[in-house]
Structure formats: structure tokens, C-alpha cells
Amino acid sequence: MAVGLTGVAQAHDGVGSTDGVINNAQATHDHDQHGGSGGHLPASSDNVSLVSKLQLDSVEGKIADVGVYKGYAYLASWGGVGCDNTGVHVVDIRNPGKPKKAAFIPTTGSAPGEGIQTLHISTSAFDGDILVTNNEICGDGGVGGMNIYDVTDPVHPKTLANGVGDFTLGNEPTDLAREIHSVFAWDAGDRAYAVLVDNEEGTDVDIMDITDPAKATLVAEYDLDETFPQIVQAAPANLTEIFLHDMVVKNIHGRQIMVASYWDAGYVLLDVTNPKKIKYIGDTDFTDPDPEPAESGLTVAPEGNGHEAEFTLDNRYVIGADEDFGPYALAARNVTDNTAITAGQGIPLNPGTALTGGSVYVGRACNGDTAVPAGDPATMDIAVVERGVCTFTEKVANVEAAGGYDGILVFNRTGSDACDAQSGMSVEGTLPTFGVAPRSQGFAIFDQPYSNADCLAGTGPQALPVAVGTKGDQATFSSHFDGWGYAHLYRNERGKMTELDTYAIPEGHDPAYASGFGDLTVHEVATSHVRSDLAYFAYYAGGFRVTKIKNDKLVEVGHYIDKGGNNFWGVQTFPHGGTEYVAASDRDYGLYIFQYTGRQ
């Protein structure tokens, strides 16, 4: 997926949209992600021992994140493939070679996913072990916010808080807290806090005081690209999907330091010692051209997608994992005007193909609007659709029902979070569908004047001022390989952090592996708790991977792919008997436990 931006706009200002635009962490999971590709790589292993594995669910794609604490593993039972049996599996791993099911915590109507963490907090109100989980509503009775459980006795967890979080939306009170994509908690001495990924608002960094877990309260919320505009990368033009996806907080030299994975704004370092007054420390930019594909001879723009990151044990480095499920990017132009069209692929072209045709304005293409006129089956016609009122899927269905079109381009609506902003899109249908393009580009296709200032002020045209059925400029769209998501090694420093190296599995930037071998993007990294140079990766169908930092480079030193393939989501280290083990969650199976056996 390649996306772009004309002018300066924030991709997630205001309240989150529900039409399929990708402007929050949860929306990334709807974009043919987390299980969109079949097949797998062949079984192989090197310097990694499989200690044990335990099947937890027979439904493919049901298992999500994993956390480990004091001899127990906690695995999310996700709602992305159905809302049945959502909750948290508790697994006894006190004997890593013989894991066994210990308990299940149901979350009826809601589903945890990325946010699974257990820790000890000791405050005046509570002294014990807690589990924090995120909630994304998937069915009746679901709640948003986070859940907090007392797992001091892991076999008999007790609910301390259910569905607590931000109970406002656009400054209006709501009955349910905002849905959240992830959560991370920390003990700050006499107080304890948790940070939540708000899926529904531009202020998507929500910080809760959980000193008394049964009385958790919201103490601050931030829109990082508004609070710290220096994190927004000016070029290339495609880095516009700006929102929080995940984060960790670590005590470094007595300060609570967060690394926030802020998608197309990269990785952001913040001092959150005082949650009510957070301070900017540094952030990353995505190198252009993208350095990892360049190693394979490809010259492409960086994808962005800062998904998850961790500090190394010695805090010298930050390792970031970019999640990218689209190995093909889009190039698009207005042929008549010889100008770029900045849009992503909602429904992609066939890999390596192109589509060129004349444009036809079809309005909003919503049910009840002016009917979409039929295209000409004898020519290549591209339906140009205005965003607004209904979902992208409804628009596509109406264009397809009209017949005669070969592709669809959606351009943006009015609104403070729209106008000349560009966003990705989640949509279902058959015809290749591109968008969401900046509003000015939609107007230009039909030679209409446009003022972004008027659009943002609400004084510009509320609809493209041409009749439905009007023909416009020629446009061309082409698909090119740009590879899967991969990892970065950054120096932990103030200001713009230096990118030292990138790491991808060999298949990740080989067009021969663009389909038929599963999702070959990285998902998460867990750094070693005993060595400063080791890191472990959950690499979806790429398996379990181990890297070592050598001379400021990420070098693979081990891997494991099971017979029949893997689909790893989460990864977490834990100690046992003086040895470091690694728990990994396989989305289609359950829990794997590994040990790195390479040279020390």
C-alpha cells in the first residue's frame, strides 16, 4: 500500500471515521492484514531449539499477543475471526518443557489483541500482580477501554476493572469507554500508570492512573503530531497515516521513557515521568529511498508503518518493527495534466499490472443518492467517487452494480480531518479501488478550481460542482513490488535518531515470495533481558527469528519455522533456571517456547 499527502494535514484529527478510512490502529487490522495471505515457507531451523508447544485453539487466526510473568503465559484470544471465545488463555509454563492450560478469562463481546501485559505494582492501594488487556468491541455486551485483573494467583484471576478508559468522544460523555488497540502499564514507585491506544479520537495517547486498579482514572490524553509537530515527516508524500499503534515504557536513569510506535510518523521517544506534562526526547524518520528494498536493487519510497519497538537491555539502541502486509505499492498519475495522484490500493491491482482509462464522476455512490451511470464496456472507464456519508464498500458495490467500469478512485470529502489529507482505505469488492486521494486532485481531474483553506473552513463546495456522469481527465494506475515489512536499528539519542541498519528475511524483498507463502512481514520484537545484543522477532509466516547486533548491524543468527509453517504474532522473553527462554504466540495454533542455542 502506498499513500500520500498534498500540503500539510494531520491524518487523524478529530473523531475517528467509520467508513473504512485507515486513521487509527484498529483500522490497520481490517486492511487485508493479520492473515490475508495463504501458504507458508518450508520448515527449517538454525540455532533455535523448540522446547515445547501447546495448542490453544482450533480456529485459524484466533490467537493474538502473548505476555509472560512469574511462570505463566497469557495469550489473547482475538475477535478478528469471530467474537466467540474471546478472552485470555492462562498457561502454566513453570516447566517450560511441559506447558499446560491453567485458566481462561472470558471477555464476552470484546476482544483483546495487541495489549497483553502482566506486572507487579506496589502502591498504597494495591500490592500484587496485575494483568492489563485491551478491548475492541466485536459483539453484543462488549466494552471498550482496558481490563485490569489481579493475577497474584494466576489460576484464579480476579477482575479489578472492566472497560475503563476515556469516556468522552469529541468532548461529549459516552456510556462506554473508547475502544483501544493496545495497553502498557508501569509501576512508577508510589503511583502506577497505563497508556492506552485510543482507536476513536485524534488524541489517541490516553494515560490512566492505576495506582488503585479498581479506581483507574484518565489523567491525560495527547495527539502527538499536534503536541510535537516535529515528528511529522515532510517527505515523501505518502507518509500520512499518523496515529499511535503501540508503545512501551521503561525506567531509564530514574525517568519513565516511552517509545511510541506512531505509524507513518515513526518511533517517538517521550519522557512520561509526569504523565500530565510529557516531554519530547527524539523520533525517527523513514529513509527515502527505502534502504531495505535498495539492498535488493529496488528504488521505492518508504512505506512507514511504525508498528512496535523496544529498547535494548543496555538502552543504547531502539529496535523498531514496521508491519507491512502489502508487498506491492501503487503509482498513479493524472495523464492529461501530467500530475501525480496520491492514493493507496484499497482493492489492489493484480501484481505488476497497470490500468489506464478515462474518468467518470459518479457522485458519492451511496444508496439513495443519484444512481451511478453505467460505464462504457467498450472503453477503459474509471469511476471517480466522492468520499462521504456511506462506507467505501457500499460505494464500490454500487459502482460494480452499474457495470462498465474497470477501476474506482475515491477522493476526499470536506471536513477538518479530510479535504486535502490522503488516507488509506479498507474496502471489500472486486474492482481495483484506489484512495483516498486529496480533494484537490479529485477536483483537478474535472478541471474545477479548489481552495484547501475554504474546504477546511467549511466555505468551499460541499460536493464536486459537476453533474454525475461528467467525463474528466485520463488517469493511470500501476502496481510495483516494494516488499514486506521489516525491522530497523536506531541509536537511542535525542532529536532525530540515527538509523544504523535494517533487517528483513531474504524472502521479504523477493518478488517470487509476494504471494503463496503467507504474510512475510515482521510483527513484533522482544529484546533479550540478559544480553544487550540479542533480539527475537515474531515474523508471521517468516517464523521465529533471532538477531545479534554486530558493529551496529542487525545480523540474523537463528530462526525456526515448523513443519506446516507458522504464523507468529507475539514474542516475549522469560527466565527459568538461569536460562532465557522465549514465548511466541502462533495465531493458528497457540503457544511455542524456544531457546536460542547459538554461540554466545
What are these model-predicted stretches?
Residues L5-N334, A383, T393, P465-Q600:
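Feature marking well-ordered beta-strand scaffolds used for ligand recognition
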Residues Y328-H480, R491:
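Structured lumen-facing ectodomains of secretory-pathway proteins
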